[in-house]
Amino acid sequence: MTSQIRQNYSTEVEAAVNRLVNLHLRASYTYLSLGFFFDRDDVALEGVGHFFRELAEEKREGAERLLKLQNERGGRALFQDVQKPSQDEWGKTLEAMEAALALEKNLNQALLDLHALGSARTDPHLCDFLESHFLDKEVKLIKKMGNHLTNLRRVAGPQPAQTGVAQASLGEYLFERLTLKHD
């Protein structure tokens, strides 16, 4: 059934919004995995876990915001399977933050591509929506993660090879306590 409210909302944009919803849900799922990995008793970096769990919630909220847009514009939400995170064991904070940065850059590129599609289809409402709710936040988050990576590389020292879960170094512990503290 076609929507009675649909106006200036192309099927290409509608499909791209559905793909972006899926990317946000996949990011949320990955951050949830990261968050609870770092909260495990054998990892015990609660601040890192909290940081990633907050990101999981933000990405889920972003998916919901996109779904609301889809309904407001007369589009139809088509849910797709959400891909599981690429791994279950995340190692050290440095490797996890690198994976998170790559994920955010991928998500940002998808947002930029959708914005370009909206511009090409003369959809100012979509472009304004993305600019107001997503693009600036993404750039700030990418910068924040880049800063965290710089500091993690500064404090990382050579680690002896271990079996099982990599143990946090003193530098990683201090980064977690001083940078990602939460109350």
From Swiss-Prot:
Q: Name one Pfam family in it.
A: Ferritin
**GO cellular component terms listed in the entry, alphabetical order:** autolysosome; autophagosome; cytoplasm; cytoplasmic vesicle; ferritin complex
Q: In which tissues is it expressed?
A: In rat liver, the light chain is the major chain.
The subcellular location is: Cytoplasmic vesicle, Autophagosome; Cytoplasm; Autolysosome
Chain positions recorded as Fe cation binding sites: 54, 57-58, 61, 64
Please give the Gene Ontology molecular function terms for this protein.
Answer: ferric iron binding; ferrous iron binding; identical protein binding; iron ion binding
Q: Which UniProt keywords apply?
A: Cytoplasm, Cytoplasmic vesicle, Iron, Iron storage, Lysosome, Metal-binding
What is any one GO biological process for this UniProt entry?
Answer: iron ion transport
> Ferritin-like diiron domain spans which residues?
7-156
- Describe the subunit structure: Oligomer of 24 subunits. There are two types of subunits: L (light) chain and H (heavy) chain. The major chain can be light or heavy, depending on the species and tissue type. The functional molecule forms a roughly spherical shell with a diameter of 12 nm and contains a central cavity into which the insoluble mineral iron core is deposited. Interacts with NCOA4.
Primary role: Stores iron in a soluble, non-toxic, readily available form. Important for iron homeostasis. Iron is taken up in the ferrous form and deposited as ferric hydroxides after oxidation. Also plays a role in delivery of iron to cells. Mediates iron uptake in capsule cells of the developing kidney. Delivery to lysosomes by the cargo receptor NCOA4 for autophagic degradation and release or iron.
Family recorded in the similarity comment: Belongs to the ferritin family.
Q: Per the entry's comment, what about the domains?
A: The rat light chain has an octopeptide insertion after residue 158 compared with other light chains.
Name of the protein in question:
Ferritin light chain 1
User: What is the scientific name of the source organism?
Assistant: Rattus norvegicus
